[in-house]
């Protein structure tokens, strides 16, 4: 059985397929290993659903009426929604599956799928989703700490990230070296860091991932 991280809410497996029999069989399969799931018969129905804030993955049919699985993947990517996807494909959909993998899909399985293999892939996919979610929450905490800085502290931290010394920062901002050191102490206290290297790493990580969301 899949073991969840005790510090994270129960993960969810979303199943999207316009074939209700597929949805039912996957629901039964996931229930058999006590995995929470929710099914949808269209991509639009999924997009309109108010998703809880937790780790999740998608089991997605690549061909559906209305918005296709590929189109949904593209929309999620455009919205910076980070949710690993396992595509279900029919015979002859291999070229589409290759495109899906290039766009970041976790895997694709051809119908009819082997139940145990599907479960194995879902468990691997959920492990990735949970790790991503923990990292996302950590980054959110870092962002909230950065937002607590004063305008002057923000000026100084950006100059520190650019590699300037306290002496050069003092000259650039027309303040004393001692004042810069006081601000640096306040910055370390607010961010919970012990060194300039940790501060720089936090800022660069948040800059890189600011636009990414989970659900």
Where are these regions (language model features)?
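Non-catalytic signal-transmission and effector/linker regions of two-component phosphorelay proteins
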Residues: 1-14, 20, 141, 207-215
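C-terminal output helix
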Residues: 93-95, 109, 113-122, 168, ...
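Active-site beta3 strand of CheY-like receiver
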Residues: 53-59
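Basic, Lys/Arg-enriched C-terminal extension of HTH/homeodomain DNA-binding domains
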Residues: 188-215
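Acidic catalytic/metal-coordinating carboxylates
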Residues: 41-42, 68-71
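Receiver (REC) domain active-site loop signature in two-component systems and cognate sites
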Residues: 62-64
